[in-house]
Amino acid sequence: MFCFQCEQTAGCSGCTGKAGVCGKTADTAGLQDELTGALIGLARACANNERKETTDRIIIEGLFTTVTNVAFDDDSIKEMIDKVNTEKSKIVPGCAACASRCGNTDNYDMKRMWEADEDIRSLKSLILFGIRGMAAYAYHAMVLGYKDQEVNNFFYKALFTLAEDWGMEELLPVVMEVGKVNLSCMALLDKANTETFGTPPPVTVPLKVEKGPFIVVTGHDLYDLKLLLQQTEGKGINIYTHGE
């Protein structure tokens, strides 16, 4: 395996071998790369073909699935890969049976990116890891019924870029655009959260651990937390979480 997505990566250079510092196995890392390659293939298929109503959601879900510590279950990643490939076959149904394949909609082999020139690999990694984090924000906004088409469109552009043999001069503007669009995505999530749950005021947070059963939650999906609080109301179950 090779992964240097998080700040805990081994030796500040990358996790290799059978497992990463986070506990992710080589098999899981390989599936995440396969999923990313499938998402790039889907984005390439959409370059000259009309998307389906479901395509944006699948792109966002797929990218979110590859964020550190989100999904280390191999079966769920395989299901996501199948979902992405099925979506692509709906958009370009004739490609799989084409007698003279052009390769324009093929899934991308991530080894090409990991083995590229150091500077190119670094710039493409900034793009990839940036849109993965952005997808988390977009997903949380999406489940609350909010979306920004500019943000959604950029996911396709960024994924398409990863498969191109571009130099630093062409990649740097895309890296800068990741930051610009991510700011719009953060504004989208802020709007979704504040219009749904209200503007959060400063409060004192109790640190006492109460007696009785409890559930510990990590992450920042406020909608899931709301549902969990509703389902445990009056049952004597305490919910503990932390801010991200």
Placement of each model-derived feature along the sequence:
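Metallocofactor- and cofactor-centric catalytic cores in central/energy metabolism, strongly enriched
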Residues: 1-244
